[in-house]
């Protein structure tokens, strides 16, 4: 039984090559069936994301799996081979556990990869390319990833600007879900901020953007209200939290506008997070008594501290994945021993059945009973001791005392 993991990721290949070896959702079902047909066990799972494509197979030949990948995508070996990595046995198990735990991700400890691995496993089950070994491998992997997140602090600290902005708001407001939020801009960063806010239960969001259509498209997904930049003065007094990220060369919020809004709020505090470069909010806003202004530099210092914390947690996570990969291989070896015992018993029974049938035929033909029984016993003894005798002889000739000792112990010779 041999587990194989072959892949390509953001560390080994350019985005251009990663796109070429990726599997689209509408094709991955048939792709897994095709890949599984190239293994002796019929087991295969394909994990394909924007940052990685990995093939996990049981009883597959490495060279054949690589050839399949190249054939499937119509790529030259010389273009793909230098960017591939491969793992076997316990190393393959450990690699999958590291991937699912976020230890091999572009952003250390990011949780999205676990959901992507789970989705790949579900698709493989639907395709019929999962049996005992791969099923146990992935189920164990999901348990390990959960253990990593509960037993370490790898996912506790923010390491993206968007996540850090929302984390800061959570520390300042005791119940962020009841706050009113004004988001300025409708780009990727603000969209990610909106996602984190929604995940934290924020229901009241307003998105202000230069282009109303762009803001409306984003608001549909998050249940927010879209406004233009010109409407900001009307909505600013209602905002407990303001997070801004536009490409404007000039500030969007000036000290005067914020001061006026604070007066209308009767000086209830307002958190303003400016993650734009150049800045969207005039730095003088920080001088206002009830305004708490943070910039992208403040967030980066938090992120650096948090990344150091994640790296420390990652060291603990590495120990967990190492230990759990050993335990999984113990289970694999137990399966192999069961298979060996079953095969040995089956072989011995076949020898017995053959010789008993021959003896019964001789008795039916009138042969002497005692002679037939003696012949049966001798033939059965010779058949059963043939393989052990050969193994003992070979170990003795080679001077392999370790193997010789193990054979003597297995055959019960040391008991006499």
From Swiss-Prot:
InterPro entries according to UniProt: 4pyrrol_synth_GluRdtase (IPR000343), 4pyrrol_synth_GluRdtase_dimer (IPR015896), 4pyrrol_synth_GluRdtase_N (IPR015895), GluRdtase_CS (IPR018214), GluRdtase_dimer_dom_sf (IPR036453), GluRdtase_N_sf (IPR036343), NAD(P)-bd_dom_sf (IPR036291), Shikm_DH/Glu-tRNA_Rdtase (IPR006151)
Site, Important for activity: residue positions: 95
PROSITE patterns assigned to the protein according to its UniProt record, in alphabetical order: GLUTR (PS00747)
Pfam families to which the protein is assigned, alphabetical: GlutR_dimer, GlutR_N, Shikimate_DH
Highest taxon in the source lineage: Bacteria
Any one biological process term the GO annotation gives: protoporphyrinogen IX biosynthetic process from glutamate
Pathway listed: Porphyrin-containing compound metabolism; protoporphyrin-IX biosynthesis; 5-aminolevulinate from L-glutamyl-tRNA(Glu): step 1/2
Binding annotation for substrate: 49-52, 105, 110-112, 116
Record-listed E.C. numbers: 1.2.1.70
Catalytic activity: (S)-4-amino-5-oxopentanoate + tRNA(Glu) + NADP(+) = L-glutamyl-tRNA(Glu) + NADPH + H(+)
Amino acids binding NADP(+): 185-190
Keywords annotated in UniProt: NADP, Oxidoreductase, Porphyrin biosynthesis
MF (Gene Ontology): glutamyl-tRNA reductase activity; NADP binding
Gene3D superfamilies xref list: Glutamyl-tRNA reductase, N-terminal domain, NAD(P)-binding Rossmann-like Domain
SUPFAM superfamilies named among the record's database cross-references: Glutamyl tRNA-reductase catalytic, N-terminal domain, Glutamyl tRNA-reductase dimerization domain, NAD(P)-binding Rossmann-fold domains
Subunit structure: Homodimer.
Domain description: Possesses an unusual extended V-shaped dimeric structure with each monomer consisting of three distinct domains arranged along a curved 'spinal' alpha-helix. The N-terminal catalytic domain specifically recognizes the glutamate moiety of the substrate. The second domain is the NADPH-binding domain, and the third C-terminal domain is responsible for dimerization.
PANTHER family: GLUTAMYL-TRNA REDUCTASE
Misc remark: During catalysis, the active site Cys acts as a nucleophile attacking the alpha-carbonyl group of tRNA-bound glutamate with the formation of a thioester intermediate between enzyme and glutamate, and the concomitant release of tRNA(Glu). The thioester intermediate is finally reduced by direct hydride transfer from NADPH, to form the product GSA.
Function: Catalyzes the NADPH-dependent reduction of glutamyl-tRNA(Glu) to glutamate 1-semialdehyde (GSA).
Family designation: Belongs to the glutamyl-tRNA reductase family.
Protein name per Swiss-Prot or TrEMBL: Glutamyl-tRNA reductase
Protein's organism: Shewanella baltica (strain OS185)
Taxonomic lineage from the root: Bacteria, Pseudomonadati, Pseudomonadota, Gammaproteobacteria, Alteromonadales
